[in-house]
Every structure is written in structure tokens, then in C-alpha cells.
Amino acid sequence: MAKSGMGTFHTGARIENVVDRDKGASIPRLLVDTGSEYTWVPATTLEKLGIAREKKDLAFIMANGQQITRSVGFAIVRVAKAFTVDEVVFAEKGDLLLLGARSLEGLNLTVDSRKKKLVAAGPLPAASMIQCADATAI
């Protein structure tokens, strides 16, 4: 995982077609961004992998306040040994390439901001039980 500016760092990832996992591409530098819900991958890469634009003209607010629209599709996102299926944004020229919070959650990875790297988030929480007045679990 490559380090970059203050408090930020990049990581590499592999993006794969959900239906045909043989169709995949490595993305060497994604900015790890817990403030972004989605992972942003070059549209040209997603198109080459045969990933369909499932949601079109989805509105996004950029960090500078500008509103833009992009398409979103489904892909397998792999970082090291972890993987998840997630929605990915078809990033256009000039867009930052990002590894977003939803992918991080699905990968069960969290940010170690001191060491500027991704680390395992630990055991996943299971359902919790709440006791009701009649002692049945919900």
C-alpha cells in the first residue's frame, strides 16, 4: 500500500466481473477514502471487463460541492486476500480513483491512520438479541 499526502494513502486492488471472474484488471492506485461511499474505477476498465451500467445518472456531490452524475455497476473488489461484491462508479477522466467505505466494510478492512494502511477489522458482529417483557427474543 503506497503512502501519499497527510493522512491519506493509496492501495492497489483487483476488479473482476461478477459473472465471469476470468475478466479482471489490477488497479495499482486507489485513494483510500472513508468519506466516499462508493469505489471509483475508470469507466474504460469496467467497460473492458464487461461490467454493465446498472444504475445510470446517479447524482454525487464532490468534496468541492459540485454535483455530478455517473453510472454504477456491480463488481468483485479484491484487496490482498480480502474480496467483496460491491457497487462501483464508472469514473471519468479527471475523477479521483477511490476505494470507498462500503467496499472497505465488505472487505472487512479498516484504516490504521497512524500507519497509513488497511488492517483486518476483526470478527463480524452477528445478530444481537433483545429481551422483551415476555422473555421472547426479537
Feature map (PLM): residue ranges:
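Pepsin/retropepsin-fold aspartyl endopeptidases
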Residues: 1-138
